[in-house]
């Protein structure tokens, strides 16, 4: 690699909105994210309101068409 053309990497702290912090190497000093693997519904297994809405739609369909 050529000397002097690559950005300087440093230890960086990534901070999530849920309070989780991660240390990685990056060219930026601090990084803030809204959602991470610690609080994302896909990784935590919680579906929240989306599942309730889908259930009520299915119930309305069954009530309307008698199935």
UniProtKB/Swiss-Prot annotation:
<feature type="binding site">
    <location>
        <position position="36"/>
    </location>
    <ligand>
        <name>Zn(2+)</name>
    </ligand>
</feature>
<keyword id="KW-0687">Ribonucleoprotein</keyword>
<keyword id="KW-0699">rRNA-binding</keyword>
<dbReference type="Pfam" id="PF01197">
    <property type="entry name" value="Ribosomal_L31"/>
</dbReference>
<dbReference type="GO" id="GO:0005840">
    <property type="term" value="C:ribosome"/>
</dbReference>
<dbReference type="InterPro" id="IPR042105">
    <property type="entry name" value="Ribosomal_bL31_sf"/>
</dbReference>
<comment type="subunit">
    <text>Part of the 50S ribosomal subunit.</text>
</comment>
<dbReference type="GO" id="GO:1990904">
    <property type="term" value="C:ribonucleoprotein complex"/>
</dbReference>
<feature type="binding site">
    <location>
        <position position="39"/>
    </location>
    <ligand>
        <name>Zn(2+)</name>
    </ligand>
</feature>
<feature type="binding site">
    <location>
        <position position="18"/>
    </location>
    <ligand>
        <name>Zn(2+)</name>
    </ligand>
</feature>
<keyword id="KW-0689">Ribosomal protein</keyword>
<dbReference type="InterPro" id="IPR002150">
    <property type="entry name" value="Ribosomal_bL31"/>
</dbReference>
<dbReference type="GO" id="GO:0006412">
    <property type="term" value="P:translation"/>
</dbReference>
<dbReference type="GO" id="GO:0019843">
    <property type="term" value="F:rRNA binding"/>
</dbReference>
<feature type="binding site">
    <location>
        <position position="16"/>
    </location>
    <ligand>
        <name>Zn(2+)</name>
    </ligand>
</feature>
<dbReference type="InterPro" id="IPR034704">
    <property type="entry name" value="Ribosomal_bL28/bL31-like_sf"/>
</dbReference>
<keyword id="KW-0479">Metal-binding</keyword>
<dbReference type="GO" id="GO:0003735">
    <property type="term" value="F:structural constituent of ribosome"/>
</dbReference>
<comment type="similarity">
    <text>Belongs to the bacterial ribosomal protein bL31 family. Type A subfamily.</text>
</comment>
<keyword id="KW-0694">RNA-binding</keyword>
<protein>
    <recommendedName>
        <fullName>Large ribosomal subunit protein bL31</fullName>
    </recommendedName>
</protein>
<dbReference type="GO" id="GO:0046872">
    <property type="term" value="F:metal ion binding"/>
</dbReference>
<keyword id="KW-0862">Zinc</keyword>
<comment type="function">
    <text>Binds the 23S rRNA.</text>
</comment>
